[in-house]
Each structure stands twice: as C-alpha cells, then as structure tokens.
C-alpha cells in the first residue's frame, strides 16, 4: 500500500476554479513523484482510493498511465468525472459544500454506483455521531465488496 499525501495547496481553493486547477496540478505532480517508481505491470489488482481533490488525481493518474484499476471516490468533486474511465464507486454527502449533489448524481448516472449520505458534509459526517459511525461502517462494507 502506498499513501499519497498532498501539501502546499493555495488558500481559497473552494469556489475558485483557477485555484482548484492549480491544486489539482500540484497534487498530480506529487502523486507522480510518489508513484513514479512503481512497476504497475507487476500487479494483478490495483485499487486507488481518493478523497476530495484526491479523487480527481486518482482518476487522472490512472487515465494518464493507462492503468486498469478499481477506483474508490470518497466525496468526489465535479472535476473527478472527467477522468474516470474504468471501474469506480462513489460516496457523497448531500450537504457537501464542495460538490452539488445534482451534479454528482448526473455524473455517476448509469456508470458509477453512487451512495448518498443524507445531510452529510465533505467528510461524510452529519454531526450525529451514531449515524456517522454507521455510515463509516456501511461505506467500508461497500468498498470491501467492490474491490473483491
């Protein structure tokens, strides 16, 4: 397992298309640096799990390097779906301020299983601890079933 953490994003990304694109390019460069020495041909199954802007990077990286993989999209942003070409599953909170639910539903329609959490934010949290723990458990079960 390789974890890619992103650093150095500009302030004020949310709602600013130019800064969002800048953050995406920075993150993609960091992912390419971290993953650059991996010989992907050595692996039968590859799973990328992305969150937020990481979902855009995961899809773009897979597309750029022509990787066949399973893509888990946790709270994807709209730009993510420009790069998803293979097997994917998505999880979105209906109160996510970073992505409109209608846009996510439309982007997933007919091609990507989408699981909505009513009232959840960009962290799939609602503020109800019991509900959030149940959501986390259901999400993990769905991810496990998806990647098997």
Q: At which residue positions do the language-model features occur?
A:
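Serine-hydrolase catalytic machinery in alpha/beta-hydrolase-like enzymes
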Residues: 1-43
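Catalytic histidine-centered segment of alpha/beta-hydrolase-like enzymes
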Residues: 120-135
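A conserved short beta-strand
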Residues: 66-78, 86-87
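Gly/Ala-rich beta-loop-alpha elbow adjacent to hydrolase catalytic centers
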Residues: 49-58
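Conserved alpha/beta-hydrolase "acid-adjacent" motif
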Residues: 82, 97-103
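Short beta-strand/loop motif that positions the catalytic acidic residue
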Residues: 90-92, 96
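Active-site signature of alpha/beta-hydrolase-fold catalytic machinery across serine-
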Residues: 60, 64
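Short, proline-enriched alpha-helix->beta-strand connector loops that line the catalytic pocket
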Residues: 83-88, 110-112
């Amino acid at each position: 397992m390789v974890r890619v953490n992103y650093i150095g994003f500009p302030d004020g990304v949310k709602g600013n298309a130019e800064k969002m694109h800048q953050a995406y390019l920075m993150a993609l460069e960091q992912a390419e640096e971290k993953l650059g020495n991996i010989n992907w041909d050595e692996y039968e199954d590859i799973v990328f799990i992305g969150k937020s802007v990481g979902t855009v990077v995961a899809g773009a990286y897979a597309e750029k390097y022509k990787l066949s993989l399973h893509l888990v999209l946790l709270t994807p942003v709209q730009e993510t779906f420009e790069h998803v070409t293979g097997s994917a599953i998505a999880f979105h909170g209906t109160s996510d301020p970073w992505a409109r639910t209608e846009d996510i539903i439309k982007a997933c329609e007919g091609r990507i299983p989408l699981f909505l959490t009513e009232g959840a934010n960009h962290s799939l949290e609602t503020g109800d601890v019991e509900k959030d723990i149940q959501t986390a458990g259901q999400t993990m079960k769905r991810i496990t079933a998806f990647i098997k």
